[in-house]
Amino acid sequence: MAATAPGSATVREAVRPGDLGTVAALHGVLYAREYGTDETMEAFVAAGMAELVLARAREGGAGPGRLWVAELDGRVVGGAGLVRADERPGWGQLRWVLLDPVARGRGLGGRLLETALEEARARAYGGVLLWTIAGLDAAHHLYAKAGFELTVSRPARRFGLDTVEQRMDLRL
């Protein structure tokens, strides 16, 4: 592993052993602490990322999508992924966006998002959609700043919470 300067923040593709587990665990721990979710959050993230990695192995090449991690001082502190949007052919779906609080405010969230959007453009997607839940104000601000617009908002029971599930879309 290359040495990094103190405070060094990077984004790279999640291809190292432990990357997926770390990002899934971060989702489980941080969402439980910050929003009160249960263990199904971590399981949902782990299952989706595992499905992506296994599909990439079957299909070869770029497969159905990619996953990136954010690192701070060489430690994984977040991640984001882009997959084909099953519900909207010709579009991508942004998934698993998260940053540890110690890494927030350093531009890493924007870098993860821009990396995923660059991949969507390279795949010639007509747009990108994402699903989120109400109350994730910092994430929603980041998405809106990138041009995403709220298109669906509905009550839902997700991850042990009564919440509002939201879909946001960005035309490319």
Task: Give the positions of each predicted feature.
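Residues that form or flank phosphate/diphosphate-binding pockets in enzymes
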Residues: 89, 107, 138
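C-terminal "cap" of GNAT-fold acetyltransferases
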Residues: 3, 16-19, 126-172
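Acyl-donor-binding surface of acyltransferase catalytic domains
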Residues: 1-8
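Active-site acidic-Proline motif in GNAT/NAT acetyltransferases
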Residues: 100-106, 134-135
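Acetyl-CoA-dependent GNAT
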Residues: 9, 13-102, 110-115, 119, ...
